[in-house]
Amino acid sequence: MSKTDLLIVESKNKVASIQKYVPEHFLVESCIGHFRELKKKNTKDGKGLGIDVANNFEPEFVISEEKLSVVKKLKALAKNKTIWIATDPDREGEAIGWHLKELLNIPKSQEKRITFSSITKKDINDAIEKPKPLDNNMAESAIARAIIDKLIGFTVSPLLHKTFNNWHLSGGRVQSVVLRLIIERETAVRDFKSTN
């Protein structure tokens, strides 16, 4: 039987298990996680951010060098097939699904997003019976997080290097806040005066 449907998962370790449970006309393949990243060279901003700050913080994505062969294979397999996106049911999985939609030019009307909590015939086939569109809000939150991480990390870290003449220092979206909380707590402990 010819394969008319392509179901894409994140992990290549899940491919064989899922292939056993899908209908015969399905082919299961992996995108091996994230395959696009924010551009680092020849960016519109000229700073290597891959974020066009002047254009509403528009991200510039490129295919990761190490994933070029995976992308080439997925594009070839996707020709004349119905595409099913079965990436992990979390924010990053939704972002990977969004990137797949963009890469494979899947129109909104043909989005088939499925999730399942366990790799069983019942769960997988129940999901296939009830596909839904991608959750663009969740995908956009992952993309926004990547943009914020890059904006903060690529601007704060060089400032720390220059200010303290120490190339081992870095700053980030989470790291900087956690460091401040630790310092505040340590200061409170040090300044504590017992009332006994």
Predicted regions and their residues:
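Intrinsically disordered, low-complexity regulatory segments
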Residues: 1-155, 177
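Prokaryote-biased recognition of long, low-complexity C-terminal linker/tail segments
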Residues: 145-196
